[in-house]
């Protein structure tokens, strides 16, 4: 990060008892809070050997965050010291009270005594230590103050101490009305475990340079790794505005403001803050100090590059391309190969919407490896794998490519990209219909949630990769009928990624989709229809597809067909093959319901060709089952059984519970249809086998509470029991069928004319 620009003008004003000592080139201010820290350090030196080793260790661990963090109320500071050493907390309070209630000369004498800490052959504090540097900064800042500023500091210290006394008086009154132990426990938890409250930060006055840098680095790290622990967007922006009010040339504050605006998708504010960041970076001369005149060009080209990245993030690809052209021009003039490689990567993102840019990606990966840019090379490999997956490349080749990128990750300790790689493997296995492998990859990533601890003490477990994996995990559980487990995962997602966080849209979409599937299974089409609007807001293609499914279920065939045709054309244009195949299967079902069975066959063959071309095994298996159902309707059940044995295994191994139930129902239908030419004994055996398959289908369908399909299975099973003369079993199935039939609306179509 660039160094902070210091004010070059004298400002005698003082806010909240804070003296602006940086007018003399000092990078720190003297505040009442820092006076309290100085008293703590003084008393710590006096205590010496009286403190045991455990207390001293606790105090040493406490000092660094106290020195680096923002100012805090005296009550909060006192609570923190009491946790480590109660006796020392009392000494600090008494010493501070003597200074605050004494005369001005007492404060003068206190600072004179601090200088003695460095005297002698074996001083109490070394000048180059963390505490020594802090003491020297404070002594120097205090010595540079005028008499009026010293007096203002003294009155501010009195007010600081008085506010603590008032708060203690209020707390004592409250404790008379409440349980003492409960209140103490509550105060310790609230005061010490949680970050500073907004009102405490806002009243602490301007931060020193080191405090500001610590605050910015902490918040930036939290935004990247654990957004829930960072300040809210409004609170953080308020704090940043306060920082910029006292130092408008603080470049890093502008950059954090840019990141904060991205959280709420504010295009104008994020662009404004990004431009201000690079303006201030050039004004401070930080780049030019180390790189000469080249520093200015470096800032300009990276400013254009970051602006292009911002436009890509919001989908403004034309503006992004213009910014990239500017960055490329300046980078070529300066012969900056690193910047050019970053430009090439973003050029791929901006142009992949127009044409296949795999050539650009391959070139970018090769160049990045040549110039020793493992992070960029790995990202390129992962983008290339994603494009190849959508293009239908074999899974083994994609996994080999990801294995090569994983070698780069582990070699260079790129833990963030390791998470992304595992999340990508999960998504690829889901795309290819291998739910078992996807589940294994998801569990692998979840077990690595403590891979790297960042400096603020949080784990890198709130990134986009974890959000993606948890969403897939929730959907996998829902597909297997474990809705309670899926709800728990979604609940955890909501806690980890609140609605205002940048990755919240992921779980919102999956939550809506799971609710939609449950409503459709339960026959509550009006509820499913109400969920379509929410899905459409998050993903227009998914929303349009589910709207067509609802229309089809409500027997609005014409409207559903029009919508599916419109969606089919759009998905073919954007090359969304997965949705194209799903749409073709839905169109074929519309033809079945309309008794146009021969017209459905070419549609299904087209879907089968697509699914095999793009290696979508699960969709291919589902398409074969639909083709088998078409042949059953056309009167060739013997051939259907041969096809089913080929297609049913992938479905039973990796399919959703609903699809397993429908597949077993189809097997039973084919077994019954093929008994026409059987002898009486062989026919009875075939019907018994069909009943067993229907029982298995019932078990699957009951798991997902699919009442419509369950009703059809019960009807079919009752007919078979009637044929076999099993009256008691027939009556039981008939009773269950009647209960479901009264609850659900009838389609008005023959039972045999629906596969799912």
From Swiss-Prot:
Q: Which GO terms describe its cellular component?
A: anaphase-promoting complex; cytoplasm; nucleus; spindle
Q: Which GO terms describe its biological process?
A: anaphase-promoting complex-dependent catabolic process; cell division; positive regulation of mitotic metaphase/anaphase transition; protein branched polyubiquitination; protein K11-linked ubiquitination; protein K48-linked ubiquitination
User: What are the alphabetically sorted keywords of the record?
Assistant: Cell cycle, Cell division, Cytoplasm, Cytoskeleton, Mitosis, Nucleus, Phosphoprotein, Repeat, TPR repeat, Ubl conjugation pathway
User: At the top level of its lineage, which domain of life is listed?
Assistant: Eukaryota
Cystine crosslinks: none
* Pfam families referenced in this protein's UniProt entry, alphabetically: ANAPC5, Apc5_N
Q: Which family does it belong to?
A: Belongs to the APC5 family.
Q: What does this protein do?
A: Component of the anaphase promoting complex/cyclosome (APC/C), a cell cycle-regulated E3 ubiquitin ligase that controls progression through mitosis and the G1 phase of the cell cycle. The APC/C complex acts by mediating ubiquitination and subsequent degradation of target proteins: it mainly mediates the formation of 'Lys-11'-linked polyubiquitin chains and, to a lower extent, the formation of 'Lys-48'- and 'Lys-63'-linked polyubiquitin chains. The APC/C complex catalyzes assembly of branched 'Lys-11'-/'Lys-48'-linked branched ubiquitin chains on target proteins.
- What is the recorded name of this protein? Anaphase-promoting complex subunit 5
Gene encoding the protein: ANAPC5
């Amino acid at each position: 990060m660039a160094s902070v620009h210091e004010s070059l003008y004298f400002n005698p004003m003082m806010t909240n008892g804070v003296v602006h000592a940086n007018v003399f080139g000092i990078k720190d201010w003297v505040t009442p809070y820092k006076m309290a820290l100085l008293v703590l350090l003084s008393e710590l030196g006096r205590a010496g050997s009286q403190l045991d080793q455990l207390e001293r260790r606790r105090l040493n661990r406490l000092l660094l965050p106290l020195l680096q963090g923002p100012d805090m109320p005296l009550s909060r500071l006192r609570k923190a010291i009491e946790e480590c050493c109660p006796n020392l907390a009392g000494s600090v309070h008494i010493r501070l009270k003597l200074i605050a209630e004494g005369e001005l000369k007492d404060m003068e004498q206190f600072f004179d005594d601090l200088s003695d800490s460095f005297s002698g052959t074996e001083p109490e504090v070394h000048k180059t230590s963390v505490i020594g540097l802090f003491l020297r900064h404070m002594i120097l800042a205090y010595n540079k103050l005028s008499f009026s500023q010293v007096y203002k500091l003294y009155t501010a210290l009195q007010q600081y101490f008085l506010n603590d006394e008032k708060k203690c008086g209020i707390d004592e009154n409250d404790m008379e009305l409440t349980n003492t132990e409960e209140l103490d426990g509550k105060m310790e938890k609230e005061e010490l475990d949680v970050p500073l409250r907004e009102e405490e930060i806002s009243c602490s006055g301007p931060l020193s340079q080191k405090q500001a840098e610590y605050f910015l680095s902490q918040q930036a790290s939290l935004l990247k790794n654990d957004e829930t622990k960072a300040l809210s967007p409004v609170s953080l922006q308020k704090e940043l505005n306060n920082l910029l009010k006292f130092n408008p040339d603080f470049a890093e504050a502008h950059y954090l403001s840019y990141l904060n605006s991205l959280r709420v998708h504010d295009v104008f504010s994020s662009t404004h803050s990004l431009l201000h960041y690079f303006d201030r970076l050039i004004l401070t001369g930080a780049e030019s100090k180390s790189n000469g005149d080249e520093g200015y060009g470096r800032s300009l080209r990276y400013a254009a590059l970051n602006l292009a990245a911002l436009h890509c993030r919001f989908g403004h690809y034309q503006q992004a391309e213009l910014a990239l052209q500017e960055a490329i021009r300046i980078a070529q003039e300066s012969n900056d190969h690193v910047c050019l490689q970053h430009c090439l990567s973003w050029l791929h993102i901006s142009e992949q919407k127009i044409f296949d840019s795999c050539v650009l990606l391959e070139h970018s990966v090769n160049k990045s490896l040549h110039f020793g840019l493992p992070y960029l090379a790995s990202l390129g490999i992962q983008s290339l794998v994603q494009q190849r997956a959508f293009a239908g490349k074999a899974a083994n080749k994609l996994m080999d490519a990801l294995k090569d990128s994983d070698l780069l990750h582990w070699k260079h300790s790129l833990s963030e990209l390791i998470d992304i790689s595992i999340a990508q493997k999960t998504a690829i296995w889901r795309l290819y219909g291998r739910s078992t492998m996807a589940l294994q990859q998801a569990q692998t990533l979840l077990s690595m949630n403590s891979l790297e601890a960042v400096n603020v003490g949080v784990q890198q477990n709130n990134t986009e990769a974890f959000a993606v994996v948890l969403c897939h995990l929730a959907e996998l559980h829902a597909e297997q009928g474990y809705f309670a487990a899926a709800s728990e995962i979604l609940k955890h997602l909501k806690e980890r990624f609140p609605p205002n966080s940048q990755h919240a849209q992921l779980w919102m979409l999956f939550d809506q989709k799971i609710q939609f599937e449950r409503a459709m299974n339960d026959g509550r089409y009006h509820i499913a229809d109400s969920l379509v609007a929410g899905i459409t807001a998050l993903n227009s293609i998914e929303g349009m597809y589910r709207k067509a499914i609802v229309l089809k279920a409500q027997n609005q065939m014409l409207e559903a067909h029009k919508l599916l045709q419109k969606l089919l054309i759009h998905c073919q244009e954007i090359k969304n093959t997965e949705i194209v195949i799903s749409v073709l299967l839905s169109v074929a079902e519309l033809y079945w319901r309309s008794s146009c069975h021969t017209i459905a066959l070419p549609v299904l063959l087209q879907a089968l060709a697509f699914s095999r071309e793009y290696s979508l095994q699960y969709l291919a298996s589902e398409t074969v089952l639909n083709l088998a159902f078409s042949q059953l309707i056309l009167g060739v059940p013997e051939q259907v059984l041969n096809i089913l044995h080929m297609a049913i295994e992938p479905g039973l191994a990796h399919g959703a519970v609903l699809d397993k139930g429908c597949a077993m129902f189809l097997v039973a239908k084919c077994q019954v249809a093929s008994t026409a030419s059987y002898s009486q004994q062989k026919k009875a055996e075939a019907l018994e086998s069909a009943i067993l398959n229907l029982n298995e289908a019932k078990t699957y369908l009951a798991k997902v509470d699919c009442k419509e399909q369950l009703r059809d299975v019960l009807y079919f099973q009752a007919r078979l029991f009637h044929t076999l003369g099993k009256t008691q079993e027939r009556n039981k199935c008939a009773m269950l069928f009647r209960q479901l039939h009264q609850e659900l609306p009838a389609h008005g179509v023959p039972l045999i004319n629906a596969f799912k």
